[in-house]
Regions:
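Forkhead-associated
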Residues: 14-90
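Regulatory inter-domain linker segments that are low-complexity and enriched
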Residues: 1-6, 12-13, 53, 88-97
Length: 97
């Protein structure tokens, strides 16, 4: 079990738990983790998937991009547990629950 946590942004302190996959976005109908108050987040912005013991972060062709370590995420990249990343203008991280 993993925990997706908002570190800074309009929903600071909000968390979502997930086991295999979670979609991040601004639209409640399309996203498991809804960042509806961040207007820089696309309706369906990014996805986190558990692949064995690794986490994969995928930008879903969002308008304003996803950043990891200051770099734009292109396609599917590994996400270390605890490493912060940015979706729109919201800072997030994944930890083990």
């Amino acid at each position: 079990m993993y925990l997706l946590e908002v570190l800074s942004g309009p929903l600071d302190g909000t968390t979502w738990s997930f086991e295999r996959e979670i979609t991040i976005g601004r639209d409640y109908a399309l996203a498991d983790a809804c960042l509806s108050l961040d207007r820089y987040v696309s309706r369906q912005h990014a996805r986190l998937q558990i692949d064995g013991s690794a986490i994969r972060l995928t930008d879903l062709r969002s308008r304003n991009g996803t950043r990891l370590g200051g770099q734009a995420v292109v396609g599917d990249v590994p996400l270390p547990v605890g490493e912060p990343f940015v979706v729109g203008r919201t800072l997030l991280r994944v930890t083990r629950a």
